């Protein structure tokens, strides 16, 4: 059964359009509240958000929904997604909600939900909440004397900074390191520079002037060109770029070269194996991770388990198998020993830990493997259109897979967070260009028809 409101990473869409309306946020608060209010006593939910203007509207609607069914609400204000997950667990809340559209532009927004363990809800829970949203919610309203209360938590950012610092070895400091950190004008704009500075680094912050409209605008992990320039300009040792909600990271070495999540996974897997912290000879990533990573890991006797795209699915596989390292090429790095969900800042600190242990420059360590030639294109489609169900598109994909043979890979998937179809091919350079062009053309023809 397909989902109506939830995608691969919560509910997401353009503000004031389905499903991201104030009415749906209100109904989600009421429905999720009913789902988690299953026994007597007080119940609570924590809410954080990034820096989008629409966050105020969505937050107000959620608060009204939760309090109407008897849940107390703790409001954090701007705070990274992983902080909300951690604080859900720390405050013994029934539920956590992060208001964000992650790496999307300001005009989009979304709602990510976390259970009491700080982990994202599974498909079953999301489907049950959707059913409640579409039903009558009147029966779940609290009596006037049992309404929930809303309270702002002023020290949430300071609490998270302490949690982040505790993930870094106490005997190690970042003294003598100059770091440029790009916070994408997003949720990490205060906490990321603060944590790095308190650990002793010389911090040059950029992307720390949010105005409600500039989140992810030519900055952050999806647009690292500025970070690269600033690293070279200030002769920094490392550049760190977060996305709008702080759950993913890409890096930049001292020469300005961008390092993606696959390279970070390769570095950490090898280092953790060497020091005995890799619990199993395997890590988890998605179908989008580069073939070069898989080959590098195989050379070290480490298996790469692939899942569908989405850090939630990576986390689920890790829980099933007991694997303690996983992530995505986009920069979600999942380390359950430190955080129940992807945390860009903690991942960056793990890389800095390796740099400190090795005494080497970032450029010497962070090109772990030679990536296989890869081409990824996003084909925009009108909302509601499903070109991948077209026989013409299916035929184009089948023909492309035959042409790729066993020497390459082709992945075609609809995004769960944006109205695009992603077409990714790996293999010989000229072949993947031709294959992607053909598949893209078939999708565009159907989408525009």
From Swiss-Prot:
Record's catalysed reaction(s): alpha-D-glucosamine 1-phosphate = D-glucosamine 6-phosphate
Residues that bind Mg(2+): 102, 243, 245, 247
Enzyme Commission no: 5.4.2.10
Cofactor(s) required for function per UniProt: Mg(2+)
Function: Catalyzes the conversion of glucosamine-6-phosphate to glucosamine-1-phosphate.
CDD domains assigned: GlmM (cd05802)
Single Gene Ontology MF annotation: magnesium ion binding
Keyword field: Isomerase, Magnesium, Metal-binding, Phosphoprotein
Source taxon at top rank: Bacteria
Gene: glmM
Active site: 102
Entry's Gene Ontology BP terms: carbohydrate metabolic process; peptidoglycan biosynthetic process; UDP-N-acetylglucosamine biosynthetic process
Protein name as it appears in the record: Phosphoglucosamine mutase
Keyword Nuclease attached: no
Any one Pfam family match given in the protein's UniProt record, by short name: PGM_PMM_I
Annotated GO CC locations: cytosol
Record PTM: Activated by phosphorylation.
Species in which this protein is naturally found: Maricaulis maris (strain MCS10)
Cofactor note: Binds 1 Mg(2+) ion per subunit.
Family: Belongs to the phosphohexose mutase family.
Modified residues (Phosphoserine): 102
